[in-house]
């Protein structure tokens, strides 16, 4: 089977079907969160939320993009403009590899607690 990067298949998912993971090592200070909000307000979502799909629960669990997800939850204007939908790129990996993916995605951003 030929490998195809997940970014070539971005889907729109209702924010209510997206959940944070339990192992996010990335912390963002309030000033940076405000900058992220300002960026999303001005430019829209330019990067998808990276998730894996939990078929049993019918939800998407965040690998990367937790703070972009938080912006949608915390700012009504963004939620309404985007109609409650977030762009999602899905990867399928076992739990131990998902944790490694989260760390790789976050390595260049924020402070890490690992």
Predicted regions and their residues:
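Amphipathic, charge-rich alpha-helical segments that serve as recognition/docking helices
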Residues: 3, 19-47, 57, 69-114
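N-terminal leader/domain-start detector
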Residues: 1-15, 38-39
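Short beta-strand micro-motifs enriched in acidic
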Residues: 52-54
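Short, conserved phosphate/pyrophosphate- and ester-handling motifs at nucleotide-, phospho-/glycolipid
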Residues: 65
């Amino acid at each position: 089977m030929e490998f195809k990067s997940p970014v070539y298949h971005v889907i729109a998912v209702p924010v209510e079907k997206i959940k944070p993971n339990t192992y996010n090592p990335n912390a963002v200070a309030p000033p940076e969160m405000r900058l992220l909000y300002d960026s999303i307000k001005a430019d829209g979502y330019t990067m998808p939320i990276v998730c894996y799909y939990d078929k049993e629960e019918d939800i998407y669990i965040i690998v990367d993009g937790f703070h972009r997800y938080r912006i949608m939850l915390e700012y009504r204007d963004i939620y309404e403009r985007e109609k409650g939908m977030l762009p999602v790129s899905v990867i399928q990996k076992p739990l131990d590899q998902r944790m490694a993916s989260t760390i790789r995605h976050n390595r260049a951003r924020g402070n890490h607690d690992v």
